[in-house]
Structures are given as C-alpha cells and as structure tokens.
C-alpha cells in the first residue's frame, strides 16, 4: 500500500492502549478486540488483496493462535508492542513445548498469518515498518524453527536445560 493508505473504519477509532493486558478482565476484553481485528484483516485479504477465502482464513487463524494463545494470555502483552523476539520465543520454544506434535507445517501457517497481520498493521501506520520487517524476517527463519523442533525430540537425560537455554522464554 502507499504511504497515503486509507485508514479503514475499524481502525479509525482504535486506541492502542485498549489492547493493554493487566488483569483477567483485560485479557477477556482484549481477546474480543483481537477477534474483531482479525475479522477485519480477513475482509482486507479477501476484498482488497483478492485472496481466496480459505487462504485468508488460514492466515487469520495463524495470527489468531499467536495472539490469543501466546501474546495475550501468556505474555499479557499489548499486540502493538510485540517485537520479533516475541515471535522467535513463541515459535522456537513455547509452541514446541505446548503442542503435542509440533511440526513445521502447522508452525509455518502461524508464522505466515502473524507476518500478514503485522504487515497490514504497518500499512495502516499502527506499528512501525521496522518492527514489521523484523517480524516478517523472523517468520521466515524456518530452518531455525525446524532445528528447534528436531532438537527437542532428540533431548536425552538432562538435555532439556540446554535446549531451553538456547531460546529462553
């Protein structure tokens, strides 16, 4: 999009501080706000980018998982304050230990959706392009994440501490 990209109606009244998470009530409220934001992203992808509904849904589902399973309930972090390190810690540690069968196919969908969301937010001047570029770069570190998954399955004896320390939460 161009620097003069229009601010879509959903984002016009958006206040970043509304996404702060300091209590359980905040978590519930922010969770709902994220659902609304992701619905808007879905519409953007289908209507303005010409993406097929199934693909747009997959992208939104990926971003949804990152935000509503990790950023909000685990980190209690405002989604507008997310940095590339958060995505690295999610994909290189949290996802692996929290998923019964962690795999790169599923993880790639989450990473792609998350990058799509942050690119959209940057186009609307809601996050910096620098942050978005770093998140996108991190989302493309698939060899690193595959190695983290493989190394996790290869842990023996006291090896978990070494694995954990390589990408701590």
Label every PLM stretch briefly:
Residues 100-109, 144-162:
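Charged/polar, low-hydrophobicity segments characteristic of intrinsically disordered regions
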Residues 1-4, 8:
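Preference for solvent-exposed, low-hydrophobicity sequence contexts
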């Amino acid at each position: 999009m161009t620097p003069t990209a229009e601010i879509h109606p959903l984002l016009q009244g958006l206040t970043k501080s509304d996404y702060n998470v300091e209590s359980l009530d905040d978590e519930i409220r922010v969770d709902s706000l994220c659902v609304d934001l992701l619905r808007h992203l879905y519409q953007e992808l289908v209507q303005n980018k010409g993406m097929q509904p199934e693909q747009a849904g997959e992208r939104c589902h990926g971003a949804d998982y990152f935000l509503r399973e990790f950023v909000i309930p685990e980190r209690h972090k405002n989604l507008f304050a997310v940095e590339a390190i958060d995505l690295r810690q999610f994909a290189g540690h949290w996802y692996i230990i929290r998923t019964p069968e962690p795999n790169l196919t599923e993880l790639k969908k989450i990473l792609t959706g998350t990058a799509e969301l942050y690119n959209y937010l940057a186009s609307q001047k809601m996050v910096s392009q620098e942050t978005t570029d770093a998140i996108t770069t991190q989302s493309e570190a698939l060899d690193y994440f595959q190695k983290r998954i493989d190394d996790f399955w290869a842990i023996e004896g006291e090896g978990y501490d070494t694995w954990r320390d390589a990408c701590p939460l």
